[in-house]
Amino acid sequence: MKVRIRGIYATALTKLFLDNGFEIVQATPQISDRFSLPIRAEPSDVTIKDGNDKGELISIGEDIYSFLRKTFQNSFIWKSPVRLYSVIETNNCKFMDYQVEPCLDKGLVVKPPSEGRIILSSPKAVGKYSMVWRGDGKTFFSEHIRDREEKTRLLSISIPFNKKGYNVKWRSNAPFASNIVLKEELEKLAIRFDNNDFRQQGEDFIKVTVSLEDKIMLDEIRKKVLPNTIRFHHMLKMSFSNEVDEIEQTSMNNEELLDKLITDYMGIEHIKPDGRKFELKEGKVIYKEVNSDYYIVRLMRVFSREGIYDGLNVKKEEGDYDIVEFDSRKWYQIHRYYNKDGKLKGIYVNISTPPELLRGKLRYLDLEVDVVKVGDEVRIIDLEELEKNKEIIGETMYKKIFTIIEEVKKIL
């Protein structure tokens, strides 16, 4: 299988994919140099790249779910139940419990399901290099096709189809195919469109929300190629760019960069298995410890609004505060809630992946289940949410969660 790789994880992923028998195509000059690879200007079967959030990896194309699940055992992995560029038939503006936008009876999936919605466009016949549909007889280009000569070449192939009333959009793989191959695909797609035959089209879309543990795993893989790779390289790359490269070329000391990420007040980003992100109330840093292998950040969060503490079922009052510690070596955070006079009201332990340090905030993947203690009573809550998200969480983390729960119960 031929793989195109882009983004901040490119070196580690290239090593990983090569070691597992994949072929690398369209490598960047830097990657080509690091691995002594020829730059193969060939179409890819699958593209791996950063998501909009550099903490995510996106795979589009052939199905490599099993390989990703085996590799990223401590991360969330979600495979879209609807293939990208497939054509679906809807019912009352819905498909598989997702709302479709716009409300078409039949449409092309142009974005995978997100926040309960699937984004559609009018049906199109989609191939490896192009899309074809009836319209005004125009040619469009992927944003990744920028070379003027290449556009001229592709236009010369699509114009005869434009004259017959077909719109053509050239996809990013098109520059790597010959004129004959491209023309043959357009002919097949035109026939498929006219026959309303969209059965075999579509690409698998997989999202990996990469945990700190798996970023460190990628650090170690990168280190085999570039021995100066520092611990937390990929995590630091989310907040810094050139600074990480400079440190690796000089001092090899990551502590300075880690310390820069810790500000007087730190936000908390709580990521759910379904991809939703929640920004929890920020806290004042009351203790920090940073060295090359780990970091600890302790926060104090003061509450001004009344309410009820989730899970604890204890009243929240003005002046209450929470003391919580984030340790990059631990799979949980213990929240201790006090009233304004310093009396303990309850303890809430959030089970999660070890926390990452980003600029001015901490981030972790929430593993759904939590442990709470009020008085002498210790309870495990939200086990049903864990079961519901077991596939995204994966078997390795699922089993680990129960070990962590027992560890937490002993502490409490």
Curated annotation (Swiss-Prot):
Species this chain originates from: Sulfurisphaera tokodaii (strain DSM 16993 / JCM 10545 / NBRC 100140 / 7) (Sulfolobus tokodaii)
UniProt entry keywords in alphabetical sequence: Endonuclease, Hydrolase, Nuclease, RNA-binding, rRNA processing
Function: Probable RNase involved in rRNA stability through maturation and/or degradation of precursor rRNAs. Binds to RNA in loop regions with AU-rich sequences.
GO BP annotation list: rRNA processing
Recorded family membership: Belongs to the FAU-1 family.
Pfam family, one: DUF402
Gene designation per UniProt: fau-1
Organism lineage: Archaea, Thermoproteota, Thermoprotei, Sulfolobales, Sulfolobaceae
GO molecular function, one term: mRNA 3'-UTR AU-rich region binding
Leading EC class: hydrolase
HAMAP family: RNA_binding_AU_1
The name this protein goes by in its record: Probable ribonuclease FAU-1
EC number: 3.1.26.-
